[in-house]
Each structure stands twice: as C-alpha cells, then as structure tokens.
Amino acid sequence: QVTWKVRLWDEKDICGEWSEKSNFEIGLLDEKDWVAEWIDPELFHEPEERQPASYLKKEFLVENSGNARLYITAHGIYNAYINGKKASDFILAPGTSQYNARLQYQTYDVSGLLNVGKNEILVTVGDGWWRGDTGYGGVRNSFGTDLAILCQLEIDRKTVLISDKSWSASQEGPLGLNDLMQGECYDARKENICEWHPVTEKQFGYENLVCSNSFDVVEKENFIGKQIHTPNGEVVIDFGQNIAGYVKFGFYAQAGQCITLYHGECLD
C-alpha cells in the first residue's frame, strides 16, 4: 500500500498546508510475487467431450483479522466463495482476453468475509472462453483442454492461503454441462456436493498474468418478463428488449422432473 499527500505553492511562492493522506494499493507485479500453484480439479480429460463444472475447496485458519486480499484467476470462468459468501459481484470472471498472451487476475477485498479461526474457501470453475464452444464456427478448446485455478490470500501482506495440492475437488455438484454458447444443466439434487478427490498441481507458469484492467461485468438492472402462451401450448417469457443476462424464476416440481428453458433474441 502506497500513501501520498500533496501541498501547493502559489504565485508568490508561499507554501500551503499538506492535504489529507490518501493511498492506493499495488498488486502482484512480478512473477516471483506468486507463491500459489496452478491446480487442476479434474481426474479425467476428454477434450472432445463436454464436462461438468468443477468445485474446489480448502479449509484454512486465520490467526488475526486485518486487511485481506484474495488474488485469483482461472483457466475457465470462476466464482469464489469464502464461508459461503461470494467474494465479488463480478460475473464471468476473469473476463475474456487473448489468454495465451494476457490472462487477467482479480484482487478482492475479503476482509469482511473472514473469521478468526476456521474458514473455508470454495471455487467453482467452468469452461468459459477457455475451452467452451466460443471459437469460430463453434470450435472448442480455443486456449486449452484443462481447467485450473490459481489463488493466493494475503492478510496484511502475509500469505495465509495458496492454491496447491492440499485442496480437494469434485465434479459431483449441481452445475453439470456448462457452455457460454450451448447453455448449462443444473441438477438441484446435487447441491450437497459429494465425491471429493485430490487436485493436481500444474506448471502453467505466471508469465502471462496481468492485473485486471477492465470494468467488471456486474448485474445492473432487473426486468420482469411478460408471460405469453402460444397456440402450441408453449410458455414464452418476453422481456421486451434484447439483454445480456440470465433468468430467475420459481416453480413447484418433483425431484427428477426436468424443466427446459430456451433463450432467443427473437420469436418465430
């Protein structure tokens, strides 16, 4: 953290008072600042087959409270939770870029999410732009075939948690097949995640990591849809405009019952 203040001299060279102190923070500027390891959550790799999202977790201890910063990125898109609370409102982190040249990492202030004593971090990671159907003509695996995360938690500049082989992972969670273009499958029966197994450390390097230099994608507005019934008996929800977002709705159903929601920019 860098602290600064200013003072001015007028046209008569008379010096004014110092301003109030302000400060800014410096992220991880050099490869050697990273002590975390890239970790791969998957046991099996079938590049041409769609895989479910992965869940990674780790319990850790915090001795003293302080200014806590979580540095994190992924091969894929991720969400991070500490003690059940989301670390950020960033949607589709780490964002899109030419990953082989620049992969952005994010810095989150998680001071208010930590407890003195026992804590748990959970990270979900899915295909995203890394290996989803986002290439020209729907080509998969544009940047690689293996998902991975890299994260490092510091409190008052002291490292208290890193991603390494001590983490556990599972593919038996509610978010199954997931793709930015093809959609996702969510199975609420699997919300109690099970079948945890060890992760694998990978030597993916740090040379392409850069601090996040773009605006976060966050929720901005909510739209209430208008329900329409077609002559064929289909239910259509019209939001009245083209948007980038997702749908929230409630319903009554039995375990195992399937509800399919199709998205489209126009109606046939």
Residue ranges of model-derived segments:
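Extracellular/oxidizing-compartment recognition motifs
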Residues: 1-268
